[in-house]
Amino acid sequence: MTAVNKITVLGSGIMGHGIAQVAATVGYNIVLRDIEQSFLDNAMKKIKWSLGKLVEKRKMSQNDADSIYGRITPVVDLKDALKETDLLIEAVPEEMELKKKVYADVDTYAEDKTLYASNTSTLPISEMASLTSRPSRFIGLHFFNPPQLMPLVEVIPGRLTDSRTVSISLDLIRNIGKEPVLCKKDVVGFIVNRIFIPLVHEAAHCLDRDTAEMTQIDSAVKFKMAFPMGIFELADYTGLDVIYKASKEMISRDKKVINPHPLI
């Protein structure tokens, strides 16, 4: 069993409200926190819509949907959001300066028992952990978009993360019905983005060299390599702005990881 009962999710965007819904679905009590009530209102509407779709498809009853929705409490005040929480999952935008400010504020109010987790897709866990008062109880939990559907979660310990935090995190991910993959080293891009981001750039190079057309490249990986989506299709779904930021971050930390294409 995990030592987690109450979870606070910081950030109510696509990832934040998705993570909140996933965890609430299996019975966790969730506080969803953002800096403005309007952001939270929008997030709760999206959660209600998502649960409504599951009811329409007869994947859950209306009573179950209402119970899940009722386990998510939207809160603006950070101090209130962190009361008695066992696990904080930070899902704010991928900007290190913003995360520095967030963790400085969190450290002011978080209780000693609270574990910290970041949903970052590229930023180094060890560096973020060093910004806090508890680097041994800091870990990366990288969910994929949309969290309600994607089964994989990368679990990334920092250099100082202790074994108990790793164990609790792995148990949590399994408890919410996801498949954890443990990254044994806090490397640039972790596992998935270390493979996927360079792949997008290489596909762009193939396109640029007139080796193949975009549809041919996507068809090749879908029908020959059994990818569920084409490389460009997935890049478009992910968002080229997201891929650009991830590429920039990865290159700044290890120039050998990517052969960057100027269009990306």
Residue ranges of model-derived segments:
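N-terminal glycine-rich phosphate-binding loop for ADP-containing cofactors
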Residues: M1-I264
